[in-house]
């Protein structure tokens, strides 16, 4: 079965959740109907996700085969004083993630970024090996641009099943999206809610969002506020539905149960004329990371 038919459209993102929050939100999300839970070794909350999954399984809310669990290996970034992971390092990272998650396999394993310029292909070969031995069902990447993906092609290796990238109306990445679609690489969008005025407001939640962007998001004349009023939905639901209509999988993150419902339970269609208006909102590159856009890594 291809990832396109297997991966749920809406999943739970767990970035910046504590282990305790990850446990609670994983459990509550599964109870609501979520089946995709996304974590990573660098989130340091895989054990919390594991407890949420365990609780859901023990209560009979879901079976393991009904869940789609994603985790990620961080490749190592020499600019941050880290060595680039080798083939064996990646194999070990997956084993450690499986232990923390208390799982025999994960549905999707991603190389978290393209920072390992010397060992990118070696790392990708490790994921293909893990896929062949059944420890992962699908192999993918995150934050890889066309050049990075072309390296895989040039090595005569199969392309990733998916690429998880920052995607929202302010960062639409049309060239990369077209490349992924043309090459049958499924698109997972993260940071879908960047344009909201409420996005990342806590201390330490820094990004490249400018004051002008903040003002635009807060304005009553914001296109997303106007469309939310038109369709009688939440502003966040406009942003999520935009992605779903473009066939992107999404991973909205929240630590509020009410928002878990909002991010999952909505049913409306954005009219084509409004989709075109949203298309005009593109501002260019990524905004999520204070240190820069990972798609610009060499």
List the model feature ranges, each with a label.
Residues 35, 104-107, 137, 161:
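Short acidic/polar active-site loop segments enriched in Thr and Asp
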Residues 17-30, 83-101, 147-150:
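Short, acidic/polar
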């Amino acid at each position: 079965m291809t990832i396109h038919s297997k991966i749920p459209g809406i999943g739970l993102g767990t970035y910046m959740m504590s282990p305790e929050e990850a446990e609670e939100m994983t459990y509550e999300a599964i109870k609501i109907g979520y089946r995709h839970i996304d974590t990573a070794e660098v989130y340091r909350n895989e054990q919390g996700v594991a407890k949420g999954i365990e609780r859901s399984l023990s209560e009979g809310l879901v079976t393991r085969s009904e869940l789609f669990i994603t985790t990620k290996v961080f490749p190592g970034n020499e600019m941050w004083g880290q060595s680039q992971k080798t083939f064996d390092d990646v194999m070990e990272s997956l084993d450690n993630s499986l232990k923390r998650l208390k799982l025999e396999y994960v549905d999707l394993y991603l190389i978290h970024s393209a920072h390992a310029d010397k060992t990118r292909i070696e790392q990708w070969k490790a994921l293909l090996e893990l896929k062949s031995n059944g420890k992962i069902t699908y192999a993918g990447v995150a934050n890889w641009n066309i050049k990075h993906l072309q390296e895989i092609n040039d090595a005569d290796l199969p392309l990733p099943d998916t690429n998880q990238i920052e995607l929202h109306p302010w960062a639409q990445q049309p060239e990369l999206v077209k490349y992924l679609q043309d090459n049958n690489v499924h698109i997972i969008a993260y940071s879908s809610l960047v344009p909201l005025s409420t996005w990342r407001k806590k201390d330490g939640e820094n990004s490249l969002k400018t004051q002008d962007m903040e003002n635009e998001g807060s304005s009553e004349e914001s296109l997303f506020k106007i469309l939310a009023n038109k369709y009688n939905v939440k502003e966040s639901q406009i942003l999520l539905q935009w992605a779903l209509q473009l066939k992107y999988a999404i991973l909205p993150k929240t630590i509020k149960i009410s928002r878990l419902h909002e991010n999952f339970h909505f049913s409306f269609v954005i009219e084509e004329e409004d989709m075109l208006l949203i298309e005009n909102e593109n501002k260019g590159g990524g905004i999520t990371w204070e240190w820069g856009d990972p798609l610009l890594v060499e």
